[in-house]
Amino acid sequence: MVAPAPAKERIQALKELINNYDYAYYVVNNPLVPDSEYDRLIRELQALEENYPELITLDSPTQRVGAKPVKSLGEIKHEIPMLSLNNAFHEGELADFHRRVKTRLGIERVDYAAEPKLDGLAVSLLYQDGVLVQGATRGDGITGEDITHNIRTIPTVSLRLRGEKIPSLLEVRGEVYMPRQGFEQFNREQIAKGEKPFVNPRNAAAGSLRQLDPRITANRPLALFCYGVGQVEGGILPDRHSEILFQLKQWGLRILPYSEVVEELAGCEKYYQHLLDLRDKLPYEIDGVVFKVDYLDQQQILGSLARAPRWALAYKFPAQEELTQILDIEVQVGRTGALTPVARLQPVFVGGVTVSKATLHNEGEIQRKDIRIGDTVYVRRAGDVIPEIVKVIMERRLPDSRPFQMPRQCPVCGSEIVKEEGGAVARCSGGLYCPAQRKEAIKHFAGRRAMDINGLGDKLVEQLTKQGLLKDVADLYGLTKEQLAGLERMGQKSATNLINAIQQSKHTTLPRFLYALGIREVGEATAQVLAKEFGSLEALASVSEERLQQVTDIGPIVAAHIAAFFRQPHNRQIIQGLQKAGVCWPEVEDKVQIVQPLLGRTFVLTGTLESMTREQAKERLQALGGKVNGSVSPHTDYLIIGANPGSKLVKARNLGITILDETYFRNFLDDTSFP
C-alpha cells in the first residue's frame, strides 16, 4: 500500500517538530512543551510509522532503540586519527606549553579555547547529509569499535542535524559520560538486583557503550557532549575552534558548558582555578581542563606528534587516586546491626581533601580484593563520595601480613555475630540492647519521614545517649526541659522547642510509626501496605510469617524480619512504653472500605513540585493505592515531574513511560482518572 501524501507530510512535520523540541530541551536547556505533549507527538508518530513502515527513516525519533542485538562489535578506522592529549600537572608545565606555542608561532599573544576535561569515553559520530550513520569509540586512535547501535539510544545524541549549510559529511567528536546522579542511582539498582556495581562513572559509560544489545544501553543514564570535529567534506567550517563549537550547537549538538576563549597564560590559570572550584558542584565528573590554540591556521603551523597535537594541552586536577597504607581495619556497627569494616589510612591528600578512612563494604569485598592491614593501596575519592580502596599493590605487601577476619562478637556490645545464609552482611544479634544500634535507631525514629521530631539532630542524639538520658526511643518522651537545657549548645528556648516537637510527634499515623520502629527491610511503602492489610499494630504483631507472606510485595525474607522483630520481648516493651507515653494514631479504616483507584499502578517523582512537597505527593498517591518507587524501571507506570527534573526523565522517555507534569498530576489527583 502506497502511503498517502497527507501521511507523508504529517510524519515529516512530526519528525521536525520533535527534533526541534529535543534541541530546545537538550542543547539550549529551554523546554518548549510539557512532557505530556511531547509524549503525545511521539505516540502519534509511532502510530503513523506502524501503519506505513516504508516511511520509517534512520533519523526518526522513534528509532533510537530500533536496532537488533549484534553478535560482536566491528572495527572502524578513523580517517583522521583521534589523538591523545599531552598532560600537565602543575603550573610550570602549563607555562612551558605556553612558551613553546608562542616561540613556534613567533607571536606575542595567544588565544586559547578553554574547555572542561570530561571524564568519559571519547567517541566519533559520522553524519551524512545531516543524518547520523555511524558511531565509533576512539580505540587506539587509529581504529575504534562500531557502537552505532548503542550511540543512537543516547537521548542527547542528535539523529539528524538541524539548520543550514551542513557539510555533506561531518565527523563530530565528543565524550559520552554518565552523570553523577544517574551513576549513583544506577549503582543502587545494580546492588538491589544483586549485581556488581561499577567503580566509577567512566567505567559505567564505557561498559554501557560496549553492549551488544542496544536495549541494555538504552536503560543506562548516558549523555554526550561534543568537543570538536574530524573529517569534513562538502562544507566550510569557521576558522576558529571556539566558533566551530558554536556552529555545532547551532546544528543541534550539545557542547560543554563553561567553554570559553581565554588570553595568554594568566587567562589559562584563572580558568583552571575557576573550574577547579566548580568541580564537585558539576552534575558530571571532570578531571581537568583542556586548552587548545583557538585559530586553526595556528594549529596547522604547530602540527602534531605521533601521539598528541602540539596545539593542545590537558591540565589535570589534583589526583583523586593516591597511594597510601592501611594502618588498621576497624569494624563499625550500623542501625540494623550491620557490621561495616573501615580501613584506617595513613592520611593522604586526594582530590582536594585529606583522607584518613575508606569503606571496605563487607567481608566478601575484603576477600575479593585481598585487603590486609599494612598493605599499600590506591585510594579513590570523587566529589562527596566516601573514599574507597581501589586495589592493593601486591609488590609492597609485608611478608608477615595476614588475611582479615571479621570478629565473632560485636565490637560494641559483645553479642554474637550472625550472617544469613547466602548473605554478604554480618550483623550484631544484640538488637536495641546494642548501644551502636540504639543510637542509630533513635536517629531513624526521629527522622522527617518517621516521627518527624524537628530539632533532634545527630549530634544531640550523640550527647543524649552518651550521658545515659536515652536508652531507647521511648525515653524521648520522658525528657525534660531541664535535662535538655544543660546540654552543650542547648539553651532554654531550644529545649522548649524540642520538647514541643517531641509532644507534637505523639500524634502520628500507623504507617509512619511502623516505619519509625526501624524493622529491617520495612521502608515507607511496606509500612503503608502492612497498615492497610492488618489495620492495627496489635493485629500485625501477632501474625505468623506464613500470613505475612500472603501480603502483596512481602516475601519470605521481609516476613521473617517482621515476625522476628515482634517476637523480641525488648521491642514489645519499647512499643508499650511509647504507647504509655501517649504516642497514638487514628484508627485505620477497614481495608474493604478503602477506595484505592490507583491500586496496582507504580509512580516515580522527580524535580520540585510547587503545590506540594514530594513527600506530600507520595502520601497522596499511596493513600489512593499507588506504589511510589525511588527509581524509574520498566515496571514504572508514570513519572511525575516538577521543576528541574533529573536523569529519571531521560530514562522514562527511553522506556516510553507516561510522563505527567504538575498541572496534569493535580487534575488527576482530583478525579483519579489516570490515563
From Swiss-Prot:
- BP GO terms, sorted: DNA repair; DNA replication
- HAMAP family linked to this entry: DNA_ligase_A
Domain of life of the organism encoding this protein? Bacteria
Family assignment from sequence similarity: Belongs to the NAD-dependent DNA ligase family. LigA subfamily.
Q: Which co-factor is required?
A: Mg(2+); Mn(2+)
The active site of this protein is located at K117
Q: Name the gene behind this protein.
A: ligA
Xref: Pfam families: BRCT (PF00533), DNA_ligase_aden (PF01653), DNA_ligase_OB (PF03120), DNA_ligase_ZBD (PF03119), HHH_2 (PF12826), HHH_5 (PF14520), Nlig-Ia (PF22745)
**NCBIfam families the UniProt entry points to:** dnlj (TIGR00575), PRK07956.1 (NF005932)
Q: What is this protein called?
A: DNA ligase
Span of domain BRCT:
593-675
| Any one of the GO CC terms | cytosol
User: Known SMART domains for this protein?
Assistant: BRCT (SM00292), HhH1 (SM00278), LIGANc (SM00532)
Catalytic reaction list: NAD(+) + (deoxyribonucleotide)n-3'-hydroxyl + 5'-phospho-(deoxyribonucleotide)m = (deoxyribonucleotide)n+m + AMP + beta-nicotinamide D-nucleotide
User: Which residues are involved in binding NAD(+)?
Assistant: D35, S36, E37, Y38, D39, S84, L85, E115, R138, E175, K292, K316
EC number per UniProt: 6.5.1.2
As one GO molecular function, the record gives: DNA binding
Keyword Cell cycle, does the record have it?
no
Function statement: DNA ligase that catalyzes the formation of phosphodiester linkages between 5'-phosphoryl and 3'-hydroxyl groups in double-stranded DNA using NAD as a coenzyme and as the energy source for the reaction. It is essential for DNA replication and repair of damaged DNA.
Keywords of this entry:
DNA damage, DNA repair, DNA replication, Ligase, Magnesium, Manganese, Metal-binding, NAD, Zinc
**Enzyme category, top tier:** ligase
- Residues the record lists as binding Zn(2+): C410, C413, C428, C434
